[in-house]
Amino acid sequence: MESKEILLSNIDKLHTTEIGIDRIKRNLKINTENVVKYCKEKILDNNCNIYKQWKNWYCEVDNIIITVNSYSYTIITAHTKK
């Protein structure tokens, strides 16, 4: 398993697509103007559990899971934990 420091040191590379923005807003029931900023703040939270599985980083905090592609740093989705 790779160190979460890799993701944290590349935090400025985080981005998402228009479809990703809509998906994240819908899944988390949020109405923020800047979804990437919202996700960055969650990932940088000291309580965030960050781990890598296969090609994705998973960031768990405040009962949500944010999925980030480990190669492109694209925020793929975010959803509440079940």
Task: Label the model's feature ranges.
Residues 1-82:
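Ribonuclease/tRNase effector modules and their secretory precursors
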